[in-house]
Every structure is written in structure tokens, then in C-alpha cells.
Swiss-Prot record:
Catalytic activity from the UniProt record: GDP-alpha-D-mannose + 2 NAD(+) + H2O = GDP-alpha-D-mannuronate + 2 NADH + 3 H(+)
Function: Catalyzes the oxidation of guanosine diphospho-D-mannose (GDP-D-mannose) to GDP-D-mannuronic acid, a precursor for alginate polymerization. The alginate layer causes a mucoid phenotype and provides a protective barrier against host immune defenses and antibiotics. Other sugars are not used as substrates.
Protein name: GDP-mannose 6-dehydrogenase
Oxidoreductase recorded as keyword: yes
Top-level lineage group: Bacteria
Binding site for NAD(+): 10-11, 30, 35, 86, 124, 271, 331
Subunit structure, as described in the record: Forms a domain-swapped dimer with each peptide contributing to each active site. The dimers assemble further. X-ray structures indicate this enzyme exists as a homotetramer PubMed:12705829, but kinetic and physical results obtained in PubMed:2470755 and PubMed:12135385 indicate that it is probably a homohexamer.
Active-site residue list: 268
Amino acid sequence: MRISIFGLGYVGAVCAGCLSARGHEVIGVDVSSTKIDLINQGKSPIVEPGLEALLQQGRQTGRLSGTTDFKKAVLDSDVSFICVGTPSKKNGDLDLGYIETVCREIGFAIREKSERHTVVVRSTVLPGTVNNVVIPLIEDCSGKKAGVDFGVGTNPEFLRESTAIKDYDFPPMTVIGELDKQTGDLLEEIYRELDAPIIRKTVEVAEMIKYTCNVWHAAKVTFANEIGNIAKAVGVDGREVMDVICQDHKLNLSRYYMRPGFAFGGSCLPKDVRALTYRASQLDVEHPMLGSLMRSNSNQVQKAFDLITSHDTRKVGLLGLSFKAGTDDLRESPLVELAEMLIGKGYELRIFDRNVEYARVHGANKEYIESKIPHVSSLLVSDLDEVVASSDVLVLGNGDELFVDLVNKTPSGKKLVDLVGFMPHTTTAQAEGICW
């Protein structure tokens, strides 16, 4: 395939070398004549192990060339990868100046092409950038319609400096954000030889995936550092601790807890977070990330409250009271906190939880329920249908399978607030998720 790559920094230069090595005809484009001269000499414009050999191979086979002529690069290629930098502004926002310049140049060139051209943003950009910046600029400069006259997609990269060639050849996944199916098919064809799952999503989802990956990596480093600092302060080798943590692929390094939704609770997590952060404070060990966990958790409860109270009704049915399905444990359940907030604001609340209802009559938690939360337990109703019938807003609080049917067949006139993730799709006119 004929590919033009705009921007020959770390991402663009690596892509140029790897794509040409896989048989594609690649044109590297940059405003820097120095970089272009290096590319045309088969030399690398950056320090990256193994890259220069690929660039030399590309030049020797005639599959790689460099130019400062933006227009010619577009006219002589079928697809353009935008790999320019998106540096930070002083306020932390992205500087899209390079993106905007390239989009204008590509747009003007597309205006003169009769055949379809595809534009793929590989630069890291915030969700909404392609739809709100890239597409309008190219459409305005080309006089053509995105998704119809020219293709548009995103293809976030997961390359690490110093291991970029290996990361390109053996990626964890290939993410394609497509405005139109033809663009997705084209990108899938380019990457079909790579041994990695190809994931096709909307443009906005692909944009968000890249940021989520990078922020998650930063969060992991910060978490490990704070744990290491506390561990050292109590006389423990933090490396030894984290080595064991990383051996658990069932819970610690898995998708189990990595699902957006409601706050955490129960008898362990809140208590242990408080205990560890209290000890860290006693030892004068700074722990800004760990110290923010409980505050963030409370914010999620407040978010649920705001979502529920945004509806113009006072009749609310809370489905689930324990912190998770399959238990009657109400200790530090965020749903109890949510119920208390609704009661405090005068909402007409009905609660259904079959496990808690049983415990209120028979279980070991009977005394806890009666002594600690009598104002909440008094609102428990044993009949799910009664709660549904008497409520205007139904809140799915935990993952009890009894509640699934309400998502599939929400009663007429009822509003649904999903804190669990039962909804197969995002927010609709009748149902809304806390994070979807």
C-alpha cells in the first residue's frame, strides 16, 4: 500500500521504518529538511535501537523516501498517517497547532485528488479532537465530505522509546477507530500480519483508549512508588511486596476490578485503606494517590446521588443494599450511604435486597441491621414488584441477577439508573448508567 507519514519524530520515524520493512511504499513527510535528508540517506533522525537498519533497508529497496512537499506526498499515496507532536500548553491542555497545520495541507491536497484518500490520526489526541478539529479542517480545505469522499480513522500507537521496533512488531493489541467501515477495513489490511488482536471501535472510543492506557501506566508507577515508600518506612522491602502482588493474575492483575461503576465498600477495602494511609501519615510518608482513594470513592456516591436526583420525582426504588450481590453484609456499603443521603433529602425511598431481607429476619446480621441502620432497614420491602410499581426511578445498586430483566424490559414511565453495568449500551431516554 502507498502510505504517507506526516511527522518524523519518534512515532513517525518508527512507523516509516516498520511499514516499509513490511513491503509498503512509504513517503516520510516533515517540515524539517534535516530529518528528510537523514531519511533519504537511510539514517535515523532519532536514537532508537534497530531503526536505522530498517530505514537503510527501506531506501535500498526503494520503498522509503522523504520529502518536505506535503501536497506531493498526499497525491502519491493512498493513506496518510498523522504522527506529529501534540505538546502540552502551559495550562496542561494539548497544543494542536501541528495537527491543524497538517490537516489543512492534507485537505488542500485531497481537493485535487479524484480517487479516495484516507487520513489516519496516529498522534495522541483527546476524545473529540478528530470529530471537532481534524474532520472540519480537512472538509473545509478539501471541499469534500468525511466518511464519504475521504476516509477518516484513528490508530493510537503503543510504542515505548528504546523498544519501539519490538513494540511495533509485537503489540498488545491493534486499536482502530473508524469513522467509516472502509477505513477500518483498510487499516485492518495494513496490520493483518501482526500477531495481535485487532479491535475496531468508534473514533472517540479509540482516542479515549490511548489516554486511558497512558494514565493507567502512570497510576501503576505512582501506586507502586507510594506502596514502596510506606513499605520501607515500616521496615519492609517494597520490591518484595510488589513482586508477590504481580503474581496474582486472578484479582490484582486482571479485569476483575477494572470496570467502571459504583463505589467500593464492604468490611475490608475501606477499613484497610484508612489504616494504611493513617500509618503512612504517622510515619510522615507522603501518599497523595493512596490518600485520595476514600475521597474519590465518596465522590462516586455523590455522583450516583446527583444522577438520581436529576429526575423530577421523589419516588425512588433502590434495588440492592449490600455492597455486592450474594451477601447480606452491609458494613460500609456505599448503597447504605446513598440511601441515607436520599432519606436525608426527603425522598420517598423503597429498598429491595433479598439477602438483606432474609438477614433482617433470620441472619447473623439481624442485630447489626436493627441497631446500626434502623432508619434504612425500615424501608426494606420484601416484594420486588411492589418496589418497582411504587417507584418512578429505579436504581440498580448491585449485581443481583433478579434485576437484569428490568434493563431488558424497563416498565413504561419508569426511569432506570444503572450503577452496576447491566445496560448493554450507553444512556438512553429511559435508562442511564453512572459511567456509560
